[in-house]
Amino acid sequence: MVNNMIKKTLIAISLLVIQQAHAAPVRDLHWSKLANQLFPALVDMGATRAGATSPAERRTRLDACKQETACVLSASLWTDAEIDAVATGAAKAPASTWRKSTVADDGVQAQVARELRGLNSVIQVYGLGTAPRYPLVDGPIDVPGSLLFNGAVKDAIELAKASEDDPALTFDASLRLAIALLDVNDAKDAIAFEPLDMAHNAGALGRSQIIDWKLYRYTAIIIPGIGPENLTMPLSARGKWNVRLAAKRYADGEAPFVILSGASVHPKGARFVEAVEMRKALIERFGVPAESIIIEPYARHTTTNLRNVTRRLIALGAPLDKDSLIVTYTNQSRYIDSPEFTFRNQKELGYMPGAIGKRLSPTELTFRPSPKSLRIDPLDPLDP
């Protein structure tokens, strides 16, 4: 009897060893979600093996580094010629290569090039220590050049190497490195609220399906966040001002929804999310129904406030040929209506997220959203 038990145990162990030897590669669900949010076209290319993928000379270049930190970082960067070649090749891939949400108004070639430039930026900022566009609120956890920073970069390179068989990131080793660099810095802001509409905006999304938009003057009241400069303060004084303005405007009945936009930005390391705190205040202090509120908890700047709000309007099925209403405190309202804001949008986004229309009061401007706002841009990996 004992011999039979030993025999059965040995057989079970043998079967387990065989099963493990033939097991599928391990998929990191966090990495998969982050890569899909930041680099959807590159993920699609790796999944289908269609169009141009990573050039063979890149793999040779990386293999020659033997995991040496400076070499791996340098070899992982995409040259302009490589970006052009891969983007041009991607444009020739079958339409079935791409998910509907991957390709924006300017096409596959532009999207792939945008993602590769964004990938370079992640490696430069989080790997090489290049200053980000907004150094006061963005960038790695540790000071570039410090022992902690250098150690984190080395760890990221090893983590990326250990993940080379991850089926979600097969496009190129640089994609795994970029995600690893973000991961070791706990830079997961871009997916912190996903699935956003189904998990956090489900009530409003359901209501939008039965809305008769013609009954309203505006599709939504847009409220940009005003972050506090204090880590312990959930909502700034101007944020509270904006919430009151929103409540008054909603009570007029001219818009079916209030869209609250703002992430946890100021100061660096803040944990209170502007959109979430404003939603809480609207419900608890002013009695605005939850199903009339949409949160947009990713925008880190006024430019992306309007870009991301446009994305939420499109998700709601709101008509883009109808005005929405931006309501915010006077200084920010003046800024949104200024040539400086137009210039900043063109410089940072490459387009205007919509048309700024009539000024109705010192705190109110009309806004007509643009579908250009659907372009994913990982140049800001915390809010693409």
Where are these regions (language model features)?
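Sec-dependent signal peptide recognition
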Residues: N4-A12
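Long acidic/mixed-charge intrinsically disordered regions
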Residues: I6, A23-A24
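Residue-level detector of alpha-helical transmembrane segments in integral membrane proteins
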Residues: A12-I13, A355
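Generic secretory/membrane-interface signal
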Residues: I13-S14, S236
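Hydrophobic h-region of N-terminal signal peptides that target proteins for export
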Residues: S14-H22
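A structural signal for short, hydrophobic/glycine-enriched beta-strand patches
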Residues: A24-P384
